[in-house]
């Protein structure tokens, strides 16, 4: 499984940097949610869009018990001053606390550690479900 995670490391970096370059404030994560949904759908994941406005819920497995794994995707109203190629392109908004990495980590979990060995259901959901 570690080998599989390493094999997609470069793609995960591309996704995280894309999320970092295009941060969106809470309840406005339309681009981020669309991108997350697009990636999940490419891997055949059943999902629900627009949960709590811009949330995404990925359904993995079936039955009971149900485990929900939440991943934040909102950014903060801060100006990024980092001088990196993937700096925020949205003035006054940036990912300053790691939320740009939460969904790529969830994607690693989905792609490298399938829910097939789990006797129930595992949902990955966005931060809107806590609000």
Where do the model's predicted regions map?
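Acidic/His- and Gly-rich active-site-bordering loop/insert found
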Residues: 2-95, 104, 112-123
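Acidic, glycine-rich active-site loops and adjacent beta-strand->loop/helix elements
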Residues: 73, 126-131
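Cytochrome P450 heme-iron axial ligand motif
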Residues: 107
């Amino acid at each position: 499984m570690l080998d599989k995670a390493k094999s997609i490391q470069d793609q995960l970096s591309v996704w995280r940097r894309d999320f970092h370059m295009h941060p969106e404030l809470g309840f406005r994560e339309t681009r981020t949610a669309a991108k997350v949904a697009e990636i999940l759908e490419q891997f055949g994941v059943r999902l629900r869009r627009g949960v709590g406005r811009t949330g995404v819920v990925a359904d993995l497995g079936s039955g009971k018990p149900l485990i929900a794994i939440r991943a934040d995707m909102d950014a903060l109203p801060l100006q990024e001053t980092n001088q990196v190629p993937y700096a925020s392109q949205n003035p006054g908004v940036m990912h300053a606390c790691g939320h740009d990495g939460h969904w790529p980590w969830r994607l690693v979990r989905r792609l490298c550690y399938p829910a097939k060995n789990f006797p129930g259901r595992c949902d990955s959901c966005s931060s809107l479900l806590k609000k």
